[in-house]
Amino acid sequence: MTKIVLLLALSIGLAIQPSEKRYPRNADEFDELFHKISNWGRWGKDDQLGAANLVTAEKRKQAAALVKSGVTVSLAHNPLTERAEDNANPFEHTMLRGFNMDRYSVAYHGYAHSHIDALCHFLYKDQTYNGYARADVNTEKGCTKLGIDTLKNGVVTRGVLVDIARLRGVEYLEPGTPIYVDDLEAWEKKSGVRLAPGDALLLRTGRWARRAKLGPWNVAQSAAGLHASVAPWIKERGVSFVGSDAGEDVTPSLVEGITLPVHTLLITALGINLLDNQDLEALGDTAARLNRWEFMITIAPVPVTGGTGFPLNAIAVF
């Protein structure tokens, strides 16, 4: 009898888990959520900065005050020059004869190279962040609005490492592992650091540790990452930038009919620039050694006019 009661209680408990954890599940629910959390018009109809507006002068001063030891950590993974399952477009470096000069060539979007996404990089139903029409933004010479050049003055703010692999006591999360609000809040409790307006959230899944141990795999098809249900929480916290050691989204997508729901919600609905493929291994080790999970971060992409992003070497300063 006791066994039956326990099984019944367990089944009831599973049945009454909040549905929000799995929401949105399909394209209709996704559309509902997109419009519910949208930041379009929040900073004016002509805004091109999005959530970067929350990085105020006061926020920069607060971030600078976090520098205690002067330790710096790069968040960039060295450019991958060999074709692999996660690197369809290897970085090319050519020396020019006669001089110590070189030429670089890279198609950085994807799952190999550390880079930042501009707000014009993603669209939803033919509109970018703030409701600009595709036809008015996308041209052969680049984006007329929301290009990476909007961040020409750079970003200095508080960075917060959210290390879900360490939270779970593993070297890395297995590909396809979804990360929910419960996980983010459990990390806040463990680390003692609560996300706040203007912050850059950096999510470590251990992707690069797994790659170093087991070799490359198709990250586009299978990667640990955020579930789309975290988007309202990210807006509530006021996060300005989100980065991870893969592409932020859990893959494959858990929202039927939507390929990259987190990219779409964060970039297009909320106006949040994403930092893809950051190497957070050294950052995780340094933060653990210092027992400090917050730091100053600098983000300074080359301001290509109308660019959809740029390779990035973000720096954390403790």
Please tell me what each predicted stretch does.
Residues 1-7:
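Sec-dependent signal peptide recognition
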Residues 8-17:
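Hydrophobic h-region of N-terminal signal peptides that target proteins for export
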